[in-house]
Amino acid sequence: MNRRHLLKAFAASAPLLASTSLVAAPKQDWRTLAQDVRTQMAWAWRNYVERCFGQDQIKPVSGRAEPFFFPGGPPLGLSIIEALDTLYVMGLDAEAEEGIRWIANNLNFDIDGEVQVFETGIRIVGGLLSGWHGTKEKRLLALARDMADRLSPAFTKSPTGMPYRFVNLRTGAVRDPVSNPAEIGTYIAEWGTLSKATGDKRYYDMAKRAMQVLFDRRSKIDLVADTINIETGAWVSRRASIGPPSDSYFEYLWDGWQLFGDVDFKRMYDVHTAAIVKYQAQQSGGHLWFPQVDFETGVVLDHHQSELAAFYAGLLAQGGDMARGKAYLASWADVQAKFGVLPEGYDYARAAAERVTNELRPEFVDSCLNLFLLEPDDRYRELARLHYEMMKTSSRAAYGFTIIDDITTAPMKQGDLCPGYWWSEQMKYYWLLFSDADRFDYKNNYLSTEGNVFVGLK
């Protein structure tokens, strides 16, 4: 199927979610499609193993390695760790064992270098925990705890309990107090899971305290801005957004309730969500969007939508607002129909791409999966199928799948990077949507903001 045919298919699919009178999705052979996803995953993995095994990321056009944590320093095998539970749930057991052997023989966090606490938490700690959940390899749990301990000074050295952005893995030295909601409030899933696994409540408590302190600094209209000084607790900006750098804070408020039954998280989620719906939800051209607003007045600041904000459709549905969740997914489905591949940034007031790159983002398909888990219906699968087919058409390169530098050119101009999260998120979401996977519990499950499965692997 070429790009023109795919765009026609996208356009035909746009009404699928446009109203509550839903149109049935076209008949598809989902199991065959799932096997294709598995085949593509295995092919990409083999290229990574042959070209740069153990390196953080692969550049699929050139076949070279790309560091993530320490440019010029030791890699942490990021792509291996991100891929572990995806390989497991797909039944690619030889590949998973290959990754575990590399981790057991090579991974060592005693490095005199600093890491970003947020990224390391969701990617390394989270990836090791989900790998442990699937494979039961005790070494993975021990490494997850080791890394969490090395990140802990970011919390314990903070006068407020909100973490610093960077920490040295060997010395515990911390840096950069000017942070944001996502980097402050996206730990409870990983840290809480670690507390349950080890019996050590310290991890849960430090993650919860950071979120509570941030929540307590909300404005009088119950919104948070996107930049704050964690030492003083003073806001540095007035911009409120459901997108980055605030997005996963809202996600983890719900997740703290879903995973651990902690009513404090449910209360905080409800307070913020009511304010977001009141001050940020906006209809434009028949679509639901969430503009950036002043967090103290609710005045609209701009109409930019980051592709990362597409996750919010699934979160709204999980939180009980299925109607708005469907409506927001429909808005993004129309953007997908317009461009074929979602742009990194979209201005809904101008109906134009603000950022023409595509970073192999998974958030749209993440929402398709979350809605599918709540309401199994092939319309969500169909939107994800179109997303997958276009990824194959536009992003497949000699040695894997790559980002796109410009989605508006014909053909689309490829970049040269496969982000670590591609292994953890995008391919897993496709597989779970298309396969009826026998290693996944579709009734009782939990996936983190990085797509790591902490509950539900069989």
Short names for language-model regions:
Residues 1-13:
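N-terminal secretory signal peptides and thylakoid transit peptides that target proteins
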Residues 23-458:
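Glycan-recognition and catalytic cores of secretory/periplasmic carbohydrate-active enzymes
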